Amino acid sequence: MGDKGTRVFKKASPNGKLTVYLGKRGFVDHIDLVDPVDGVVLVDPEYLKERRVYVTLTCAFRYGREDLDVLGLTFRKDLFVANVQSFPPAPEDKKPLTRLQERLIKKLGEHAYPFTFEIPPKLPCSVTLQPGPEDTGKACGVDYEVKAFCAENLEEKIHKRNSVRLVIRKVQYAPERPGPHPTAETTRLFLMSDKPLHLEASLDKEIYYHGEPIIVNVHVTNNTNKTVKKIKISVRQYADICLFNTAQYKCPVAMEEADDTVAPSSTFCKVYTLTPFLANNREKRGLALDGKLKHEDTNLASSTLMREGANREILGIIVSYKVKVKLVVSRGGDVAVELPFTLMHPKPKEEPPHREVPENETPVDTNLIELDTNDDDIVFEDFARQRLKGMKDDKEEEDDVTGSPRLNDR
């Protein structure tokens, strides 16, 4: 898309009086800072009359099923809420325009007004917990929403006809410099055996991209008089739910149970390959997945990267992965080691420089809503939200009663 112009996502209110424009739907967390959420809102001043236009950014953690919300009590906690008054522009909310905002205001005209939000790095990334087959309503997890609406003040009830809601996501990508190869070893002494059993395991690298096979090297030195009957290899996802207190959930996402045996006074060495796929884990309720946008599929949640000492500050869901290697020993119990690793998407390649479109060339894209091939080549595309099985789409959500965003609701 980069060679056809700058893609800009748009979404209008049901009555068409407010339209929000965003340059992207995923905002990257660089550990120390997060990409700013910058966009513009196009308003109809004649429709607004004496009312104002507000834009709100909310990071929320839904930790219970939506159908269990009763008596005004919801299983949801707002982790972050920020408001700006976009129209008329409030002096305290004025910030320098980004390049995207300058271009959009130039293109859309005098009734386009900017808004910018800074996402604190300590906020969690967008994560969805996979619903069970019988679950209905919005899935549990962490999501981010930009909402624009017109009202006389922030306390006023928000009506769906003159409001716009867009779900965005906060994402992280794999670091460019991987850590050392994960290795682990353990030695176990058994009763009635003078010498020990030694297990050593390692991975071929520390960072794996989604869909890549994980190579596990296993080396066993069995100097005991016992037999290793079986070797079990598993990839486990750990999700730390940090809210009122911290609870950890673990879920195997790939497993291999090999009938390899290691006789007494012998050694064994073998390489195993496992590839964790969401497709093989569709029925596991509570499995952490990457936050979604639009109606495309997602994947297992990426590992969470944090600054040193930041784990005590973060609320939400922290995801990590480990490979577990377990030896089943006859009449002796199990011997096991764990190898932590990172599972993420690679950092996308930088978009190529903007190219002016020749006069005789017209960009063609089936998903385009508007396009302009003149001085500022901006392509407008409908902002469509992704959803998981069991989640309601935008139309159904807009039929819900929408409360007013307040900072003291946190």
From Swiss-Prot:
Segments of this protein annotated with the region Interaction with SRC: 1-163
Broad class of the protein's primary localization: cytoplasm
Subcellular location: Cytoplasm; Nucleus; Cell membrane; Membrane, Clathrin-coated pit
Post-translational modification: Constitutively phosphorylated at in the cytoplasm. At the plasma membrane, is rapidly dephosphorylated, a process that is required for clathrin binding and ADRB2 endocytosis but not for ADRB2 binding and desensitization. Once internalized, is rephosphorylated.
Annotated Basic and acidic residues bias: 347-358
Binding site for 1D-myo-inositol hexakisphosphate: K250, M255, K324, K326
Gene Ontology, cellular component aspect: clathrin-coated pit; cytoplasmic vesicle; cytosol; nucleus; plasma membrane; pseudopodium
GO function terms (MF aspect): G protein-coupled receptor binding
GO BP annotations, alphabetical order: G protein-coupled receptor internalization; negative regulation of Notch signaling pathway; positive regulation of ERK1 and ERK2 cascade; positive regulation of protein phosphorylation; positive regulation of receptor internalization; protein transport; signal transduction; ubiquitin-dependent protein catabolic process
Annotated signal sequence range: none
Keywords: Cell membrane, Cell projection, Coated pit, Cytoplasm, Cytoplasmic vesicle, Membrane, Nucleus, Phosphoprotein, Protein transport, Signal transduction inhibitor, Transcription, Transcription regulation, Transport, Ubl conjugation
List of residues that carry Phosphoserine: S404
One Pfam family hit: Arrestin_C
Start and end residues of each stretch annotated as Disordered: 345-367, 389-410
This protein's domain notes: The [DE]-X(1,2)-F-X-X-[FL]-X-X-X-R motif mediates interaction the AP-2 complex subunit AP2B1. Binding to phosphorylated GPCRs induces a conformationanl change that exposes the motif to the surface. The N-terminus binds InsP6 with low affinity.
Sequence similarity: Belongs to the arrestin family.
Description of how the protein assembles with itself and partners: Monomer. Homodimer. Homooligomer; the self-association is mediated by InsP6-binding. Heterooligomer with ARRB2; the association is mediated by InsP6-binding. Interacts with ADRB2 (phosphorylated). Interacts with CHRM2 (phosphorylated). Interacts with LHCGR. Interacts with CYTH2 and CASR. Interacts with AP2B1 (dephosphorylated); phosphorylation of AP2B1 disrupts the interaction. Interacts (dephosphorylated at Ser-404) with CLTC. Interacts with CCR2 and GRK2. Interacts with CRR5. Interacts with PTAFR (phosphorylated on serine residues). Interacts with CLTC and MAP2K3. Interacts with CREB1.
Function statement: Functions in regulating agonist-mediated G-protein coupled receptor (GPCR) signaling by mediating both receptor desensitization and resensitization processes. During homologous desensitization, beta-arrestins bind to the GPRK-phosphorylated receptor and sterically preclude its coupling to the cognate G-protein; the binding appears to require additional receptor determinants exposed only in the active receptor conformation.
Protein name: Beta-arrestin-1
Organism: Oryctolagus cuniculus
